[in-house]
Amino acid sequence: MELETSVYRPNVAVYDSPDGVEVRGRYDQIFAKILTREALSFVAELQREFRGHVKYAMECRREARRRYNSGAVPGFDPSTKFIRDGDWSCASVPPAVADRRVEITGPVERKMIINALNSGAKVFMADFEDALSPSWENLMRGHVNLKDAVDGSITFHDKSRNRVYKLNDQTAKLFVRPRGWHLPEAHILIDGEPATGCLVDFGLYFFHNYAKFRQTQGSGFGPFFYLPKMEHSREAKIWNSVFERAEKMAGIERGSIRATVLIETLPAVFQMNEILYELRDHSVGLNCGRWDYIFSYVKTFQAHPDRLLPDRVLVGMGQHFMRSYSDLLIRTCHKRGVHAMGGMAAQIPIRDDPKANEMALDLVRKDKLREVRAGHDGTWAAHPGLIPICMEAFTGHMGKSPNQIKSVKREDAAAITEEDLLQIPRGVRTLEGLRLNTRVGIQYLAAWLTGSGSVPLYNLMEDAATAEISRVQNWQWIRYGVELDGDGLGVRVSKELFGRVVEEEMERIEKEVGKDKFKNGMYKEACKMFTKQCTAPELDDFLTLAVYNHIVAHYPINVSRL
């Protein structure tokens, strides 16, 4: 007979965990309503069933990286040509989300959720990924907030303004973005190993909300998701199996869960048909995650000095490789009968400078007109103030049609070649580009370490993608001693030059944020981490993974089973 030994700690509450599951995050009675034994059992079932598949997929990523670092480049897979050439379609788009012309995104914070659902956008993507610093508090409060949002009871009292926020009668449709496959959840151990972050995000949200969501949001479908950071269709296949497993557990029809996949890695652009094929019963399209796509381009070609990017502000949708990526996504999605979603407008209204504000809004207007004329069915905005401009651009072109899936001429996707998708972007590299990367990267990381994953910087709403671009571009420029040719200096980037830039930019940051905020924030710690990342001999895959342990806070295990 096995004995159960309890370690006595008076007045310490514990989560009611099933066998093999240890919750190492802080106990809170509110969190306990999310971390029920039944919900944790469901997450554990997902983890045990799919962890082997996830580990294999991550090893395949590492093997692909080794090939690219040895000189190979991504391309279309000859073995799946039959899928690309085949005459097949994804399941019909649910009526509840046929019209997605403007979507707003943001972290799973309580006030943000209310404002976004009330914003007038068609969809709100609530984010557990790049717009959220995945601390235990942020994650668990996010689940509490989403549960309250789905059942309609969510409110927020802003004491500083003495204002209570609540949901309108008509709200945006809710999509949720879990983390990518590569990120762990170190506060929940399953059979002694950290759980897979996205399975925790998906599992807890689905378990608590699927029934109510299908009544109030999905008209019999749902829940709805966004899936990030995939590099290959095998990763989409895992998600499809997870969805089928969840539908079976819930006793709902196969194909109820629907997801849009972000095409935000360079390898994935060659796998779009295959990704849709694996998710064909659960897909509602693809999205141009263009900022992470630029990050992925640099990371994929980290060992290719002939493929260095110019200043990141010059890598827009006018570059041939970016325009080709967008066009291929549109043609692929419409051929398969699903949404082709456009990219993020990250601008923030500039309230104290009307002239600068109008210039910023004009950039948004032109970008959204370009998207809708190209054939996109909808677009993203980071701020509610941008929604009217985005809506005007799409409605002005689409009229009353909910989307352009059938109305836009389906041009042949095969006309876009590997060469189009890999064409080296043009533009200059400047000292100011190095400075901006450094200044933004350090400030974003400082905010992330203190719990903020969505950060307003220089009139843009930045998330982890910006810090990633800044980091990998600095690393590549230092690694290859790039000549800065855009400002007439003609100097080469070195660790010494970068060190001087870091010192000067830290002084600038201190002046901009003020001495008190600089002293009390984590700017010095962020500076050390960012500098280390930019000057390391080997490039880490993800900044958020490399620094994750700095926000993990374990609490004692109170019950041991021997």
UniProtKB/Swiss-Prot annotation:
Sequence motif Microbody targeting signal, location on chain: 560-562
Principal EC category: transferase
EC number(s) stated in the UniProt entry for this protein: 2.3.3.9
Main location: other
Keywords: Glyoxylate bypass, Glyoxysome, Peroxisome, Transferase, Tricarboxylic acid cycle
Catalysed reactions, as listed in the record: glyoxylate + acetyl-CoA + H2O = (S)-malate + CoA + H(+)
Entry's Gene Ontology BP terms: glyoxylate cycle; tricarboxylic acid cycle
Record GO terms (molecular function): malate synthase activity
Record-linked CDD domains: malate_synt_A
Pathway: Carbohydrate metabolism; glyoxylate cycle; (S)-malate from isocitrate: step 2/2
Active site residues according to the UniProt entry: R177, D463
Keyword Ion transport on entry: no
Protein name: Malate synthase
Biological source species: Arabidopsis thaliana (Mouse-ear cress)
Taxonomic lineage: Eukaryota, Viridiplantae, Streptophyta, Embryophyta, Tracheophyta
